[in-house]
Structures are given as structure tokens and as C-alpha cells.
């Protein structure tokens, strides 16, 4: 697994052994960031990487010009790899790693975010809790922010209060759904 673009292009990333963490494939990440770049520049963006795992998505965003990344992950082995990857790429000053379950920290997130990258366990996409979680996340985003959800291509993406689906792309068994946060639909943040 490697960074596919930006200042750290081709740099290898650490990943925990085993099947518990499912890093986003390089070609899927390349496609995701190509589509993201066609919609909005990443330069200076504040990025939230939910269910961060190794941090591959958020670190890719930082490599491509984002100014700040918040990584939320609860698995101990993934956190070790994530922290090592942040350190190896020199992104300590631009990164905040939160060792907690996403559901527990969403209310306390310090936004606003321009881009949210969400790669939850695929089974969670079918649960109403994910839609509720992403609706809360939308409240911590700028209007017109982009939320990207990675999911099993067979599963329909959930509806998110405060955001509209703009499109879904399929990469083999992987689906990427892009949402745009709408100022008209956005729920208020709990400050």
C-alpha cells in the first residue's frame, strides 16, 4: 500500500497484519482523489478521516495539499500503523489522531471540515447508525463540503441529513458515494 499522488507519491504505508483492517486499494484511492480534484481543490482543505484505519485516505489528502487532517480510529493495531504513517510522512503538525470510536467523538469534533473521508466496516453501511453518524458529521462541515463514503458496491448508500448524493462510482466490489453538504439541508452543529 502506498501514497498515489502529491508530495509523497509512491511512499509506502504501514498496515497491520491480518484481515481486521481493510485498507482502500491504491487504484480506488487514485480514482477517489481524481474525482475529488475535479470537484474541489484540496489545497488548504481541512479533512476528516473517519474509521481511518492506517490513515491512507487522510494521508493521501495531506500529500495532495490538504492543510489539516483529523483521523478517528479505535482499533489498537490500526492506530499503531496510523501513528507510524503520520510520523514517517512528517505530518505530525498537520494531523490530529483521535483514538476513539467515531460514534463517541462526533459531537466534539472541531470543524468545520471541507472533506470527510469515511471508510467504515462494510456491514455498518447497512445500519441506520451510520446514516445518523454522518448526519451529525455534516453539521461540522462547511456548506458545499464533500463527504465520500466507501462501501460494498452491492449496498445502496445511506441518506444523510444535510447532504445530497451527487454520484456513486464502482470499482469492482467497492462503491464510492460522493455527497455534497447543503447549507439549506444542514442540521445545526451542537456548539
Language-model segments: which ranges?
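Class I S-adenosyl-L-methionine-dependent methyltransferase catalytic core
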Residues: 1-191
Amino acid at each position: 500500500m502506498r501514497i498515489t499522488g502529491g508530495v509523497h507519491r509512491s511512499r509506502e504505508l504501514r498496515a497491520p497484519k491480518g484481515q481486521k483492517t481493510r485498507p482502500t486499494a491504491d487504484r480506488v484511492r487514485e480514482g477517489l482523489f481524481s474525482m475529488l480534484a475535479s470537484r474541489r481543490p484540496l489545497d488548504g482543505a481541512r479533512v476528516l478521516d473517519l474509521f481511518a484505519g492506517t490513515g491512507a485516505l487522510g494521508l493521501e489528502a495531506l500529500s495532495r495539499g490538504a492543510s489539516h487532517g483529523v483521523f478517528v480510529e479505535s482499533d489498537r493495531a490500526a492506530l499503531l500503523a496510523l501513528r507510524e504513517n503520520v510520523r514517517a510522512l512528517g505530518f505530525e503538525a498537520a494531523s490530529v489522531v483521535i483514538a476513539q470510536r467515531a460514534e463517541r467523538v462526533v459531537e466534539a469534533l472541531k470543524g468545520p471540515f471541507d472533506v470527510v473521508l469515511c471508510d467504515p466496516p462494510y456491514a455498518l453501511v447497512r445500519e441506520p447508525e451510520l446514516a445518523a453518524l454522518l448526519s451529525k458529521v455534516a453539521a461540522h462541515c462547511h456548506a458545499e463540503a464533500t463527504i465520500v463514503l466507501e462501501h460494498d458496491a452491492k449496498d445502496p448508500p445511506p441518506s444523510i441529513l444535510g447532504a445530497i448524493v451527487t454520484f456513486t462510482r464502482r470499482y469492482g466490489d467497492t462503491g464510492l458515494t460522493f455527497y455534497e453538504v447543503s447549507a439549506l439541508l444542514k442540521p445545526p452543529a451542537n456548539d
